[in-house]
Amino acid sequence: MMTLVIVFGIGGCSLPPNENHDRSNSLQTKTKWMNDPQADLNIENGLTAFLALDDAFLSIASRIHLIRNAKHQLDLQYYIWNDDAIGNLMLHELLNAADRGVKVRLLIDDQNGIKLDKALKALAQHPNFEIRIFNPYKFRHLRFIDYIFRLKQINHRMHNKLTLADHSIAVTGGRNISSEYFDAGDQFQFSDMDILFYGKAVERAEEVFDEFWNHPLSYSTEQLLGQGTAQQLENLRISYKTLDQVNTPTEDKLEAAQDYLKLRLENYPIQWAKAHFVADHPDKARGQAQQQQLLYSQVLNIMGKPEQHMELVSAYFVPTERGTAYLNQLSKDGIKVRVLTNSLVANDVAVVHSFYSQYRKPLLQNGVQLYEFKPNIERKKRTWYEIATGSVIPVKGKNRSSLHAKFFDVDGKVFIGSFNFDPRSAHLNTEVGLVVESDHLQDQITAMLDQHLLQVAYQLKLDEHGNIVWCEHKDNGEVIQHHHDPESTRFQRFTMNVVSYFPIEWMM
């Protein structure tokens, strides 16, 4: 009986035709966003201003700053947009922008699930608010059927993260829209990196958004969810206003972060450099992109082969045999190669660790420096918020944490974006990022890693027998050596070893 139901469902349920859906492009009206008297000249000379955002609250504040100050248009593109405090805060801010006449376009990958469907359906009723869903599942409430019969199609996801305002200023990086990416989760936090940029590189970012927005894999909410009603939109307004009336520590920190960010943009010198927005073509989600349309090809062309050093931070690191050979050869050629990724217990996608772990020993044997992010981080320094407000945030033990950042630098060129060093980012998902040609930014990143790496990560080495040891550096100078993945159980290690034999590395 179940077989008949599934077969009948497959025959009777299909996505609506979408090849000729309404096309729209970004408005070309630009807004001035900073008080730099040289800004216009720098942009004419092909330069881009940038501000790296390693602090979670400054990162969410930058997005809210763009939304609240946009005058003409907002374009947002995300892989995950959760139905939580941060997700609803951002939707409310976008609704407020639409109310004051700003054109809002929101594109979300359908891997996000159905929890936001009700809100998205209501928001799409607003005349200034357009919402599309990328590469949707046919069976929205029985998604396992898609995994069985449409794996080739739904295995490609839009992993992009991008916020654009007035065709002038943007934020990209590794963070999705969810509380755990912005230090607002109750039990779990991601450590991540974004970058705010203004100037020449934004032009390409807007072109990329339009390519995805107008692609046949982007479906309107009306096509997938049906038409919403004015009453549904009004009910959503009421729920957002109710949430607004509850003042939380998160709201206080966000207000302080926005003030701090505004001060930085208006009164502090902002770095300018040549920068390149890079992205996969949306046809990659169909497996049809040409080589030159792939992000990693664009990055290699811009950054070139390392001559002095390469620092790589990747939440999900599966170098494959080819990538391992490449990194090993760099190290043999005398180039300093330093890699930071998640430890087994820190990794929120544990199966990825199964296919990374087999490459650790060959990398170490050839001189590649390897570090693994600890699953529990104790905060050692005062945050910008404590310094700016004179307050002290109490620390209650350790926070469960995971590395989610994706950035690397090669000889004065820095990439910050959504791309992980793994087969999924290279061949399956679409990705975006910004390459900045800046010795200053590279020096900042190198100094940050030098200062904090031994605090937040285990240093991997080989002992006299050629076995891997995990070195945990304590504040008092003591070094504790672990002889298996720290804080893991025997069952976890056994399971990861078994999974590593499955022929699915190409999906990682």
Regions found by a protein language model. Give the residues of each.
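Bacterial N-terminal signal peptides
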Residues: 2-9
